[in-house]
Amino acid sequence: MPLTDSLRDDILAAVPSLRAFAISLSGNADRADDLVQETLLRALANIDSFQPGSNLPAWLFTILRNLFRSDYRKRRREVEDADGSYAKTLKSQPGQTAHLEFEEFRAALDKLPQDQREALILVGASGFSYEDAAAICGCAVGTIKSRVNRARSKLSALLYVDGAEDFGPDDTVRAVIGGNG
């Protein structure tokens, strides 16, 4: 399939969501940017394998996820400030409560198993349907639903959130934890 203007525009429209997903996976904006760039290069190099009429964002997210997993396996042996002592010296004190709440949310999200975090980010934050998230992750729809449910339950417990409380500083956090946005 040739790269049409419409297809190019659709790919470019997916970049912000790809970057957000890459950041949620890697926890590092620079690595996320590298993942997105490599995803776009791979997608363009393999544009002939994209099936017209199928879900372009799901195809792109699948490429990104596979790249992340490959990169993760390579980096698993690297030690990069494992205890965070160096990073703590670089941090400045946040000036707003929302920033503190988001950091607390981010820390809780990082405690989730990788498969649950991926499912939750895809469904809760990126707005993919359970079916699309299952296609991206290469598993059954029921598996995605289970992962999302377990992730939401664990996040709620980690953040001491019950059904009556406000779910966080913004709509994305509320959608991820509460399932509505």
UniProtKB/Swiss-Prot annotation:
Transmembrane segments: none annotated. One of its GO terms (biological process) is DNA-templated transcription initiation. Belongs to the sigma-70 factor family. ECF subfamily. This is ECF RNA polymerase sigma factor EcfG. The lineage of its organism: Bacteria, Pseudomonadati, Pseudomonadota, Alphaproteobacteria, Hyphomicrobiales. Keywords: DNA-binding, Sigma factor, Stress response, Transcription, Transcription regulation. Residues 15-77 are annotated as: Sigma-70 factor domain-2. Sigma factors are initiation factors that promote the attachment of RNA polymerase to specific initiation sites and are then released. Regulates expression of hpnP under a variety of stresses, including high temperature, pH stress, and presence of nonionic osmolytes. GO terms for molecular function: DNA binding; sigma factor activity. Residues 103-155 are annotated as: Sigma-70 factor domain-4. InterPro entries: RNA_pol_sigma-70-like, RNA_pol_sigma-70_dom, RNA_pol_sigma70_ECF_CS, RNA_pol_sigma70_r2, RNA_pol_sigma70_r4_t2, RNA_pol_sigma_r2, RNA_pol_sigma_r3/r4-like, WH-like_DNA-bd_sf. Pfam families: Sigma70_r2 (PF04542), Sigma70_r4_2 (PF08281). The keyword Zinc does not apply. SUPFAM superfamilies: Sigma2 domain of RNA polymerase sigma factors, Sigma3 and sigma4 domains of RNA polymerase sigma factors. The sigma-70 factor domain-2 mediates sequence-specific interaction with the -10 element in promoter DNA, and plays an important role in melting the double-stranded DNA and the formation of the transcription bubble. The sigma-70 factor domain-2 mediates interaction with the RNA polymerase subunits RpoB and RpoC. The sigma-70 factor domain-4 contains a helix-turn-helix (H-T-H) motif that mediates interaction with the -35 element in promoter DNA. The domain also mediates interaction with the RNA polymerase subunit RpoA.
